[in-house]
């Protein structure tokens, strides 16, 4: 409000015209959803989980090599007999222990072996009370 003394007095007494500000309703900005771009971070390598279903003891060294390279390994022993399964589990348990890794029993015939650099959280309550060293009972 530009004016002199008289305008200020009239304004004080309530006789001046008030300037109304125009209310402009703004339209909400439209959300632009583009395709997400996945970018690999430098220095971060992709973690690859390996799944094995061995048929003979000869395959166990390849499974151990995957653990040594830092990959978590799922081993399915459903198609082999109990004695061979015990030998495979014993070998992989030794490998996992030597690497400072972890073993998680998913069910009586499926195991998850994880190297030291992989953290596995949670627990399978159904199997936690069963003996660890004889998984084929």
UniProtKB/Swiss-Prot annotation:
Pfam family, one: SepF
InterPro entries: Cell_div_SepF, Cell_div_SepF/SepF-rel, SepF-like_sf
GO biological process, one term: division septum assembly
Top-level taxon: Bacteria
The entry's keywords: Cell cycle, Cell division, Cytoplasm, Septation
Keyword Transport annotated: no
Annotated transmembrane regions: none
Location of the protein in the cell: Cytoplasm
Primary location recorded for the protein, binned into one broad class: cytoplasm
A single Gene Ontology CC term: cytoplasm
Annotated signal sequence range: none
Family indicated by similarity: Belongs to the SepF family.
Assembly, per entry: Homodimer. Interacts with FtsZ.
PANTHER family reported for this sequence: CELL DIVISION PROTEIN SEPF (PTHR35798:SF1)
Known role: Cell division protein that is part of the divisome complex and is recruited early to the Z-ring. Probably stimulates Z-ring formation, perhaps through the cross-linking of FtsZ protofilaments. Its function overlaps with FtsA.
Protein name: Cell division protein SepF
Organism annotation: Carboxydothermus hydrogenoformans (strain ATCC BAA-161 / DSM 6008 / Z-2901)
């Amino acid at each position: 409000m530009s004016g002199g003394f008289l305008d200020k007095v009239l304004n004080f007494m309530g006789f001046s015209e008030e300037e109304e500000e125009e209310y402009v309703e703004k339209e909400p900005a439209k959300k632009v959803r583009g395709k997400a771009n996945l970018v690999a971070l430098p220095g971060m390598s992709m973690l690859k989980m390996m799944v094995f279903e061995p048929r003979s003891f000869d395959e166990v060294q390849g499974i151990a090599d995957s653990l040594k390279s830092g990959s978590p390994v799922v081993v399915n022993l459903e198609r082999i007999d109990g004695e061979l399964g015990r030998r495979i589990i014993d070998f992989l348990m030794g490998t996992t222990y030597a690497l400072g890794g972890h073993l998680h029993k998913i069910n009586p015939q499926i195991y998850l072996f994880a190297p030291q650099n992989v953290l596995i959280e949670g627990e399978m309550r159904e199997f936690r009370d069963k003996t660890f060293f004889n998984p084929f009972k």
